[in-house]
Every structure is written in structure tokens, then in C-alpha cells.
Curated annotation (Swiss-Prot):
This is Large ribosomal subunit protein uL14c. Belongs to the universal ribosomal protein uL14 family. It is found in: Plastid, Chloroplast. The lineage of its organism: Eukaryota, Viridiplantae, Streptophyta, Embryophyta, Tracheophyta. Its main location: plastid. NCBIfam families: rplN_bact. GO terms for biological process: translation. It comes from Pinus thunbergii. It comes from the Eukaryota. One of its GO terms (molecular function) is structural constituent of ribosome. Pfam families: Ribosomal_L14. GO terms for cellular component: chloroplast; cytosolic large ribosomal subunit. Disulfide bonds: none annotated. Binds to 23S rRNA.
């Protein structure tokens, strides 16, 4: 569960390393984000000489969470870290590579570009 003030690792090569969630997009009273949800975040750590810089406000989609996620068939999905991918306004990733596994639920949520860039789909 990702809520406000939660730090996430970035799982792509867009130039950001860590972000801090400031808002979960969706309903106005929504408190937590899960896999596949879009958040608004601030970049806290960035790679030098890259397009994204520290303290920039970006949109990101959550691809892995430490909190377990239950599928319809009863299978539980859990990861070692909270990770996200930086996206633009249309939902396309800003990076050209995605590191680590992603959940297959992203394909159903129309993030097919992220799924196609990922090395493994769970």
C-alpha cells in the first residue's frame, strides 16, 4: 500500500532513482495506491546529467509493492521493494528500459508498453 510520503524506487532508466508519493490519483478520498495505480510524486534522488532532475513533480505508475496483492484466483503477489515507473500524461513510460518483474495486471490496465519493456511478467 502506497500512501502519501511513501518513498519508492524507480524501475526504469528515466534518470530518477527515488521518488516520494504526494498524491494518489483516482477518487478524491483515496488514501492508498496498489499495483497499477497512478500517483503524483516528487523526485528525491536523480542521476546527474539526465532529463529528470531532483524536486521535479512527475506522474508514475506503481509496479511492485511490499504489501501483498491478492489476485482473483487467490494467489498472493508480494515484492521486496516498492517500485514505480515514471510516465507522461498519455501513460507512456519516459524511460526505454524497465528493470525487474512486473505484474500481469498492468496489461489489463492498458500499460502494455511497460509490460512489453519488462524482462519478466508475474
Amino acid at each position: 500500500m502506497i500512501q502519501s510520503q511513501t518513498y519508492l524506487n524507480i524501475a526504469d532508466n528515466s534518470g530518477a532513482r527515488k521518488i516520494m508519493c504526494i498524491r494518489v490519483l483516482g477518487a478524491s478520498n483515496r488514501k492508498c495506491a496498489h499495483i497499477g495505480d497512478v500517483i503524483i510524486a516528487i523526485i528525491k534522488e536523480a542521476v546527474p546529467n539526465m532529463p529528470l532532475e531532483k524536486s521535479e513533480v512527475v506522474r508514475a505508475v506503481v509496479i511492485r509493492t511490499c504489501k501483498e496483492f491478492e489476485r482473483d484466483n487467490g494467489m498472493m503477489i508480494r515484492s521486496d521493494d516498492n517500485a514505480a515507473v515514471v510516465i507522461d500524461q498519455e501513460g507512456n513510460p519516459k524511460g526505454t528500459r524497465v528493470f525487474g518483474p512486473v505484474a500481469q495486471e498492468l496489461r489489463q490496465l492498458n500499460f502494455t508498453k511497460i509490460v512489453s519493456l519488462a524482462p519478466e511478467v508475474l
